[in-house]
Amino acid sequence: GPSHSVTHPNLPETPLVPKLSDAPVAVQEDVCRAAAKDLSSYLNDGSIIGTAWGRTMKSFANYVSDLGVHNVKVVQINGKTNETSVPVGADDLSQAIARAGHGEAYVIPAPVAVDSAEIAEMLKKERNISAALTLARECQIALFGVGNLSRNTILYRSGSLKEEDFIELEEKGAVGDVCTCFFDARGEAVSSSFAKRRISITLEELKKIPCKIGVASGLEKKEALHAALLGEYINILYADEELGKELIAI
């Protein structure tokens, strides 16, 4: 049928990816494929692009092909998960884009969340970590998925987000995250113990990145995506048509 599009106050008119399957993985793959196909149009020689890991981005890595640009710098905008238990392909995505953009990948050499706010503050001052975070703030493009607050996420299952963090975030009204930064239904950052222990850029810093590409699929992302758009954390959206139509309905 005709390709539907969505108009939202915080987005240009956005074509939606046709939903051709009832299998969530297939829908996710189609959305990732559409976003990956357009990636080169957002990049120039020497562009700095930030990526955040997660299930959607792990899938995205499979569809990246030569970008026709050179010297692209790819930087991880959130620290590593405890990858021993749950592979998330954080490095796969950075490496795939770096190869396709004939450039280099930089990771934040630290876990996404550490044991205390004090350790987080110290680590953010450590030379290599500080350099990676500085580069992340200099991105012209950020590429990320949208997470909902759920125990079935890599963040929770890997132990980076503890049960007490989950309960605190829930009590404070968190509905989802981008780049492991949680926000409430109005799209406002939720301050929490987890936020203080996190090694990543902040939502305020993300907001300053000119080109923010959000990739999302599945109706369970509805509330989180709606809030992320209210918060203006996404200005280029790739979503399936079922999810996109829900945004108009809210």
Language model features with spans:
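N-terminal active-site beta-alpha-beta segment that forms phosphate/nucleotide-binding
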Residues: 5-117, 222, 230-250
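Conserved phosphate- and dinucleotide-binding cores of soluble alpha/beta proteins
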Residues: 1, 80-250
